[in-house]
Amino acid sequence: MPRSANLRERILKVAGEKFLSQGFYKVSVDSLVAELRTSKSSIYKFFSSKEDLVATLVDQLNGIINRQLQQIVDHADLGFEDKLLQITRFTGKLLGLVSERFLEDLRIHTPDLWESYQRERQRRIQTYYRRLFEQGIREGLIRDDIDLQLIILAYLQLTELTVQTDELSELPYSGEEVYEHITTLFLEGTLSAG
């Protein structure tokens, strides 16, 4: 890997770790420079601004999520329950890595980026979860007497809780735990008796 590409990847790795765990608003570019042992000009060679760096990280995060969901949903040897379990574990792990502070910073300090992130999350649910729920219906594990679009809309609204940091901070649960509880709550209303 060329040296400049390596530096770009290192910047993304260090910034990603800091931003996702601590949020990005209070993490200074100077602190990234110190940790990377490089200069501001080196960072700005790849990213025009801190917001550009955050946008690149969000794109990277969306790519990781989409690839993993695609891989799980496309796995021909897995049934609905196994796919659901893998998706729940993956999402729970992801929510453990992405702090409430990061999501709050996105919402407050970069509203356009937040809206873009939300649109991608909604598109992801419409795409991958639709396919998952369709499989569950075919396997007789999800009720077929409820409109699929309504199931997806309900799921989308319930999972919105995992990114609403104001409401989440009032609960004694991590984002990961909230997601697990939401999934359980949701499925007990959609699973068939047989």
Task: Label each region the model flagged.
Residues 1-22, 26-38, 52:
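Basic, helix-initiating cap at the start of DNA-binding domains
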Residues 11, 49-55, 64:
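Short amphipathic alpha-helical segment with a characteristic S/N-K-E followed by hydrophobic residues
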Residues 37-47:
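Short hydrophobic/aromatic patch on the recognition helix
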Residues 56, 60, 70-98, 152-155:
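Hydrophobic alpha-helical connector segments
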Residues 81-82, 120, 138-154, 173-177, ...:
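All-alpha amphipathic helical-bundle segments outside canonical DNA-binding/catalytic cores
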Residues 86, 93, 127, 131-139, ...:
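C-terminal peripheral helix-coil segments that are non-catalytic and often amphipathic
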Residues 92, 96-130:
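Short secondary-structure transition hinges
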